[in-house]
Amino acid sequence: PGRPDRPALVPPVDVPHRSPFTAEGLAALLHAVCHIEFNAINLALDAVWRFAGMPADYYRDWLRVAAEEATHFGLLHTHLQSLGYHYGDFPAHDGLWEMCVKTQHDITARMALVPRTLEARGLDATPPMQARLRKVGTPVALRAVEILDVILRDEIGHVAVGNRWYGWLCAQQSIEPLSHYRRLAREHSAPRLKPPFN
């Protein structure tokens, strides 16, 4: 997958936190979600390209996920452009892609730690983000809430795809899924999931 020159990629602690109650802060928030969706497109396509020998349904599932992630990116980027900004105008971090690199040689780890951990965290983070945007209350913020509704609905399906293929892979290898997940999370330094949980 291609990587554009922008946005500038910085450590997560160096991504500035801005209030969504300002125009620039709202744009920065939209940009952050746009960056997640951009990476999600590449992650889904990498899952198709990198791992040979899976059932045909696996490839169909991840191509559908990639198409939905591209739709999300398009919705967010169009909204960002309506504010006078473009993808790449704010710095971003590369946590999602770093996990892709860490799991590039192990499809079971990929299914465990990208859709079932990082994408699942998005399910937890979206409702509080929407609540903040509702407090902003501007038409721009409320449109962002609507876009996040679409994303949240689709991401539930993406996590389910990851669960399906993680379970299938564990069954093929006679691995107990829960204990193996904990081992993979430790081995790959996956982020610990924090409440609130959705």
Positions of the model-derived regions?
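Non-heme di-metal
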Residues: 1-198
